């Protein structure tokens, strides 16, 4: 009989032997000593304890956790990948002989020689953990069964489809405003990762989904119980009880219909490229899904003017996008595009869509200042029935990625902050130079800066106000989520005279809260507008006559 077959047979055999006959021998190493480094690595050890979590079977962790009955308790992982999942259960006391090692810094017993069943001792009571108060205890509780009695909020789902994990936070969602002290380090003590008892990539089925096949940010879970560990740079919990989620942030309805006012909206199309395999779709099937999603968003927004960002910088891409959007719309609701020959040298461009049945396009212009890698586009509009002029400028400032080693580095507001601030300054000067009869201009698009950062400070100092800010609670002022932190990068900004004409406004949270695997290039692409982009659209209704 081979080694692992002998182990399984031995385990099944000793279940029937009285505990005292097998487990009364001395010489066991305290789990606390193994964790503390008192026992030398790569040596043979005997440990005993109560089984607290069993993660055996296909695509699982390949082992189980033991915990002693001291206070405070210590826990340890036993790596036994060939052991059948039916051989152990929580509450069972066992004695394990094997080799003590550290795997990626985590202590564990592996290369098992013997496992003895010492009888049923009763399930270990979990240690209560509250965040952020107990954040300093998490290292000491690695390998221990814990319970989070307070409600935890889903604040990150980026890894859900990739590795089956969710980022959770105490005290509600993690919000990023750009103000000093609002960064990732400020939130570190509030976070824990809910894992799935496995480190396998692309789990199937994807765990923790609701009946709609999603798990939105803002949903909550209470009484989370499992084994605490630290892996891949984060404290993680492998649940021993199925988590029960509350859909605290259900999918929102489209903005309410408002036929009389003028509606202006932002729309990030997340790299709409006809050139396959570049930034956008990798195949014709993905492109078709992207088209369908974007058409659903446009129908839901029902805007008169749309400021687009992330369209491939070639004329055919914008033409195709407009054609695809118009296919499902009645004649009076179809769009025309406003672009400009001077669209910049970047791979992507901005553009404006508007409804000719409702608006007359009076003039267009582009800001060709070389400070802009994506030239802003301005359109002047007047209602078809007559009325005052309104300008809408589509913008997309430099992103916080591709950081340089020197110069405009990250000094607390992301790299390229100086460039974004200069772009804001140039934009204001350009708009002033084109102002027609004192008509106001709505700045619409992706500023790539949070509300309290320098570019927004400069725009506010020039009299620009966040048109959607009045109708939104602070917790709803976000359009993008990065590393579990929600913040606003996309804006509709204008002078107070325009703000006085706002009848309704909001952010349609259809994208940032949804897991990426629902996107057009994801593993499980969803139908409809959900995860049509990684940015949420902002909309505003104006009484403009």
Each predicted region: which residue ranges?
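Extended non-catalytic accessory segments flanking core domains
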Residues: 21-277, 283-297, 327-329, 359, ...
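Solvent-exposed loop/turn segments at secondary-structure junctions
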Residues: 71-73, 84-85, 101-104, 199-201, ...
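Structural recognition of the beta-strand scaffold that forms the well-ordered cores
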Residues: 64-67, 96, 146-148, 193-194, ...
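N-terminal signal peptide c-region/cleavage motif recognized by signal peptidases
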Residues: 15-20
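Structured beta-strand-rich core segments of catalytic domains in phosphoester-bond hydrolases
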Residues: 317-398
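N-terminal, active-site-proximal structural segment of metallo-dependent hydrolase catalytic domains
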Residues: 21, 236-349, 405-428, 439-440, ...
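Metal-dependent phosphoester-hydrolase catalytic domains
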Residues: 216-224, 228-249, 314, 356-383, ...
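Active-site His/acidic residue clusters
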Residues: 386-388, 394-417
